[in-house]
Amino acid sequence: MSNKNEALLRRKARVRRALRAAANGRPRLSVFRSSKQIYVQVIDDAAGRTLAAASSLDKDLKSSLKTGADKAAAEAVGKLVAERAKAAGVTKVVFDRSGYIFHGRVKALADAAREGGLDF
């Protein structure tokens, strides 16, 4: 494994450890960012279940997006996951950035999820 990937894995583990301590029973809003798409899930770690999920590959979004790898796609995914989480009865979450820097697509997704009604 390269040093860059090892550093990402270390950051990811560090962020998850801190979240586990601060969660207080709240579900986790987990982000995965690939080079071409962005994915997000609302996970209940106590039950080990995914409560809501959205990605730039969803049929609702894919036709309206130019690409799944830009800020506009991240904003659309953030709004969609907030809508689905509220439908599942979730309003308070902890944000798991998965070791990614809170900038660009990750920040755009988080801001859109907040605007959509998620509290973190």
Swiss-Prot record:
Belongs to the universal ribosomal protein uL18 family. It comes from the Bacteria. PANTHER family: 39S RIBOSOMAL PROTEIN L18, MITOCHONDRIAL, LARGE RIBOSOMAL SUBUNIT PROTEIN UL18M. GO terms for molecular function: 5S rRNA binding; structural constituent of ribosome. Coiled coil: none annotated. Transmembrane segments: none annotated. Keywords: Ribonucleoprotein, Ribosomal protein, RNA-binding, rRNA-binding. Part of the 50S ribosomal subunit; part of the 5S rRNA/L5/L18/L25 subcomplex. Contacts the 5S and 23S rRNAs. Disulfide bonds: none annotated. It comes from Methylorubrum extorquens (strain PA1) (Methylobacterium extorquens). InterPro entries: Ribosomal_uL18_bac-type (IPR004389), Ribosomal_uL18_bac/euk (IPR005484). It holds the Pfam family Ribosomal_L18p. This is Large ribosomal subunit protein uL18. GO terms for biological process: translation. This is one of the proteins that bind and probably mediate the attachment of the 5S RNA into the large ribosomal subunit, where it forms part of the central protuberance. One of its GO terms (cellular component) is cytosolic large ribosomal subunit. The gene is rplR.
